[in-house]
Amino acid sequence: MIEVKNLSCSFSEGAFTKNKFTAVSPISAIFKNGGRYAIVGESGSGKTTLARMIAGLQRPDNGNVLIDGIAVYGRRRIAEKEHFKKVQIIQQNSASALDPKMTIGKSIEEPLSCFFHMEKAVRKKRCEELMALCNLPVDYYARLPSELSGGEQKRVAIARALAASPECLIFDEATNGFDLPLRKKIMEE
């Protein structure tokens, strides 16, 4: 279960000003295991900032996120590696999450090695399964992100996030541009 407690975040209006604008006003919510939730709002309403705070990528000004009762922020908090195993985010700009010098296969295999310590042959087999799930040809295994289209890079980011077998998967408009059958297939996984 993920609990958002009085979470808020603001950003500076510029390098030469002390003025700040509020990206996320204090918000509290509970997301139970097994549920599917949507955070909707207008452009600029703070959806991405909220998602990044839940994922542990953006420190809030106030409040906290609890994963199974353990804080994400503060002195007594969940270990970063454990957090990233439990919560994965696929961001709007998926290409920024990919190492430009790492092949697609190695990128997808990295969570399998880091979190599950799988043998190389087992990792490669699981990687190929995830690539098939995300409609990526197996011969993309040895390609670099720069050799793929934006949509293909997004599918690699999804396969990589699924490789961690997270309890919570956050899509920040990550399936935009995908056809309905592929969206459904990814959401079911």
Region roles according to the model:
Residues 122-139:
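Conserved ABC ATPase "signature" region
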Residues 144-148, 152:
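Conserved ABC ATPase signature
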Residues 55:
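Helix-to-loop junction immediately C-terminal to a conserved catalytic motif
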